[in-house]
């Protein structure tokens, strides 16, 4: 029995929810799952011009240390089980950002036999960033949209 069983929905729980969600938005640690050319723009977002660190984000190499997965690029059928495996290794709470036309719906390779038509068929996606490839500004906007979504979540009072 956790804190959600003790506290009923009210002022205290909503204040605690606000505090917890604020801390989650300020410390997203993304794991890069770069599969194609969109990964270059993802790296560009981490460089000095856009500096993704100012949002409290630090790219992590391990799924156990990250809470955000950025899927960037064409997802092939052979790579889909690896994507699911990495997603399952991430700790809760976890979020997925799909970056680019290929990750969103297959892109130019939509009709190919070897391409998964969207990574949302393998893992649940929270935010879609359109473009081919999307710019670093679009990725940052998608991250801001994800932070707004996290702020609206109910952590304790479900």
From Swiss-Prot:
Keywords: 4Fe-4S, Cell inner membrane, Cell membrane, Iron, Iron-sulfur, Membrane, Metal-binding, NAD, Quinone, Translocase, Transport, Ubiquinone
Catalysed conversion reaction: a quinone + NADH + 5 H(+)(in) = a quinol + NAD(+) + 4 H(+)(out)
Annotated positions binding [4Fe-4S] cluster: 37-38, 102, 132
Cofactor: how bound: Binds 1 [4Fe-4S] cluster.
Chief place of localization: membrane
The keyword Transport is annotated on this UniProt entry: yes
GO biological process: aerobic respiration; electron transport coupled proton transport
Superkingdom of source: Bacteria
Pfam families given in the database record: Oxidored_q6 (PF01058)
UniProt cofactor(s): [4Fe-4S] cluster
Keyword Ubl conjugation among UniProt keywords: no
Topology of this chain in the membrane: Peripheral membrane protein
GO cellular component, one term: respiratory chain complex I
SUPFAM superfamilies in the cross-refs: HydA/Nqo6-like (SSF56770)
PROSITE patterns per UniProt: COMPLEX1_20K
Protein localization: Cell inner membrane
EC number: 7.1.1.-
Molecular function per GO: 4 iron, 4 sulfur cluster binding; iron ion binding; NADH dehydrogenase (ubiquinone) activity; NADH:ubiquinone reductase (non-electrogenic) activity; quinone binding
Subunit annotation: NDH-1 is composed of 14 different subunits. Subunits NuoB, C, D, E, F, and G constitute the peripheral sector of the complex.
Family: Belongs to the complex I 20 kDa subunit family.
Biological role: NDH-1 shuttles electrons from NADH, via FMN and iron-sulfur (Fe-S) centers, to quinones in the respiratory chain. Couples the redox reaction to proton translocation (for every two electrons transferred, four hydrogen ions are translocated across the cytoplasmic membrane), and thus conserves the redox energy in a proton gradient.
NCBIfam families linked: nuoB_fam (TIGR01957), PRK06411.1 (NF005012)
Protein name: NADH-quinone oxidoreductase subunit B
Source organism of this protein record: Leptothrix cholodnii (strain ATCC 51168 / LMG 8142 / SP-6)
Origin organism lineage: Bacteria, Pseudomonadati, Pseudomonadota, Betaproteobacteria, Burkholderiales
Gene: nuoB
